[in-house]
Each structure stands twice: as C-alpha cells, then as structure tokens.
Amino acid sequence: MASGRDPREARPGELEIWDLSREPWDEWLRDMLEDINQEAKMHFGRELLFQVWNYCQEEGERNRTPMLERAYKYYKLVQKALFVHFRCGCRRRQPFEPYEERRDGQGGGRAGRVPPGLD
C-alpha cells in the first residue's frame, strides 16, 4: 500500500468468448457442450436437456440465428441452470433417474438434432 498501487487485480477490458485464441470457435463450443451435457445429464435428465436444445433450435429458426449462436445459447442456459442447481444445494448422490418419463414412449424432446454429448 505504501507504493500507492491498488492491490486488486485490474479488470479486463471488454472480452467476448469468441475473442479467446484457444482453438477454432466451433471446436471449442463442441467440446464445451459435450462436457456440460455430461454433467447436466446427472442432474436434470436427458429429456429436459432435449427440450431446452429444441427450444434454442426453434427460437433460432424463427430469428434466423446461425447454428453456432443457437448452440451457444443452449450452453449458456444449461450453465446457468447448473449454477442455480448447485447454488440451491444439489442433494443428488447418484445419476439422474428418469422417473417422470412418459410411459407411452412419446417424450417431447426428441425432434430434430441431438445436442453434442447426449447421443
């Protein structure tokens, strides 16, 4: 403190996720989707994840959003849901059991493409 410098780390400027120079954006996003889907399957179940994926796809088709932006929107929604789930206290000790699946086999989340990591 004697030097007059602020001991806190300086806040970075406006940095967007696509500004990071790790690997191509689509490869990074695909890897992150696979990772987050593996974790989300244990807490939410596949059917709910399919429904969120289909919501993002349908919303993107209505707005003519590119596929990568739709996938990124799905990633952000699942990431926020996991954050809230853990923040509220996850009490799950075993992987998710699909106890609420429809018995006639007509689940609402299987139309269209499959999110990466859920095939």
UniProtKB/Swiss-Prot annotation:
UniProt cross-references to Pfam families, sorted A to Z: VPR
Keywords: Host nucleus, Host-virus interaction, Inhibition of host innate immune response by virus, Viral immunoevasion, Virion
Disordered: annotated segments: 98-119
Domain of life, per lineage: Viruses
Gene3D superfamilies referenced in this protein's UniProt entry, alphabetically: 1.20.5.4730
Subcellular location: Virion; Host nucleus
InterPro entries from the UniProt entry: Lentiviral_Vpx_assoc_factor (IPR053711), RetroV_VpR/X (IPR000012)
Annotated disulfide bonds: none
GO cellular component annotations of the record: host cell nucleus; virion component
Alphabetical GO biological process terms: symbiont-mediated suppression of host innate immune response; viral life cycle
Subunit structure: Interacts with the P6 region of unprocessed GAG. Interacts with host VPRBP/DCAF1, leading to change substrate specificity of the CUL4A-DDB1 E3 ligase complex.
Function: Plays a role in nuclear translocation of the viral pre-integration complex (PIC), thus is required for the virus to infect non-dividing cells. Targets specific host proteins for degradation by the 26S proteasome. Acts by associating with the cellular CUL4A-DDB1 E3 ligase complex through direct interaction with host VPRPB/DCAF-1. This change in the E3 ligase substrate specificity results in the degradation of host SAMHD1. In turn, SAMHD1 depletion allows viral replication in host myeloid cells by preventing SAMHD1-mediated hydrolysis of intracellular dNTPs necessary for reverse transcription.
Family as reported in the entry's similarity comment: Belongs to the lentivirus VPX protein family.
Other noteworthy facts: This is an African green monkey isolate.
The protein's name: Protein Vpx
Gene giving rise to this polypeptide: vpx
